[in-house]
């Protein structure tokens, strides 16, 4: 497992899983999760590790778990 703050831009594919709720969170954090395609706790999406995705992950590291896709 990679900690969200250690994610680097690369050609790799990432599995991003929401692990915490957005209740009580800021609107920009909810918007970031929605932009990544995450809708609920335990939901996982697969994205390329480009600059946009890594930037979004870095704004919400406490809400997601990031792993390299197999």
From Swiss-Prot:
> Could you tell me which PROSITE patterns the record lists for this protein?
RIBOSOMAL_L30
Any GO molecular function: structural constituent of ribosome
A GO BP annotation: translation
Q: Record's GO cellular component, any one?
A: cytosolic large ribosomal subunit
Q: Which PANTHER family match?
A: LARGE RIBOSOMAL SUBUNIT PROTEIN UL30M, MITOCHONDRIAL RIBOSOMAL PROTEIN L30
**HAMAP family recorded for this chain?**
Ribosomal_uL30_B (MF_01371_B)
This protein's assembly is summarised as: Part of the 50S ribosomal subunit.
In its UniProt entry, what is this protein called? Large ribosomal subunit protein uL30
Lineage of this protein's species? Answer: Bacteria, Bacillati, Actinomycetota, Actinomycetes, Micrococcales
């Amino acid at each position: 497992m990679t900690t969200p703050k250690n994610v680097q831009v690369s050609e790799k594919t990432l599995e991003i899983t929401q692990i915490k709720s957005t209740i009580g969170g800021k609107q920009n954090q909810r918007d970031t999760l929605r932009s990544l395609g995450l809708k609920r706790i335990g939901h996982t999406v697969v994205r390329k590790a480009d600059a946009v995705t890594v930037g979004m992950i870095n704004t919400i590291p406490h809400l997601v778990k990031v792993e390299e896709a197999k």
